[in-house]
Amino acid sequence: VLILGTGYLGKALAESLRKAGHTALTADIDPQKAIYEADVADQASMQGLAARIPSPQIIVMCASTRGGGEEAYRNLYAHGTRNTLEAFSGTPVIFCSSTAVYGITDGRWITEEHNVYPSSGKNGLLIQAEQAVLAAGGTVVRLGALYGPGRCALASQYVTKGKALPGAMDRWLNYIHRDDAAAALHLLCTLREPPAGIYNLTDRTPMQMGEIYSYLSNLLGKPAPQPEPLPAEARRGFSNQRISCSRLMALGWEPLYPS
């Protein structure tokens, strides 16, 4: 397995595969984080990577923009996906995307059959990358918000600043623990035939933001944060949806952290 991007999720996936006896090769723009240094946004870099390593059985693209803007998305996802597919033509690819591409704002349940709505330029670039992977017979995994050891933006904002994330308290949020995400990708990598198509990757329990803050308030003995009203144009940029992960669970994956 070749893992492109060894950040929060990619590192956990590599460790999981190696513990199970699989060979996990890693590549990252930061040479301190991976076996190979490579920049997916650079065509020559990816061609060089393909020349240096054995032909992988499968590739997992889980690089992150690390909070970058639209140009970072274009380089990493639009250019990076194209460069990867060209350099490793014929190799199955698993592309880590986001449930944000659905762009639903009315709280309905969402499956992989729902249409996607590019509510922002960033989401449009993610959709473009997804389409390229699917056209090549690959797999798209749409992840909810990652959390786990040392990482949870919602809790961090509340604990350190006493503030809530933007959006209404009745907004539905969809999370996935890093270890569960790594386990799901591990499963997809090691199935006899890599399943093409789209898979949602969230825990089994969407929760409203106010419900989460109420739980944290009781747990920590702190007042729950107050929501800040947002103008209508800002509200349209925040998804409000409940994501189903039934398709992935049908393959045998079960989250250790179901809520």
Language model features with spans:
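Conserved Rossmann-fold NAD(P)-dependent oxidoreductase catalytic core, especially the SDR/UDP-sugar
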Residues: 82-121
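N-terminal Rossmann-fold NAD(P) dinucleotide-binding loop
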Residues: 10-11
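Glycine/proline-rich active-site loop of Rossmann-fold NAD(P)-dependent oxidoreductases
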Residues: 124-127, 146-162, 166, 179, ...
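Glycine-rich "substrate-gating" loop/helix at the edge of Rossmann-like oxidoreductase active sites
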Residues: 117-120, 144-149, 168-178
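C-terminal amphipathic/interface module of NAD(P)-dependent oxidoreductases
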Residues: 236-259
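NAD(P)H-binding glycine-rich loop region in Rossmannoid oxidoreductase-like domains
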Residues: 32-33, 37-89
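Conserved beta-loop-beta element that borders a ligand/cofactor-binding pocket
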Residues: 98, 128-149
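Mid/C-terminal beta-alpha module of Rossmann-like enzyme folds, strongest
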Residues: 182-233, 239
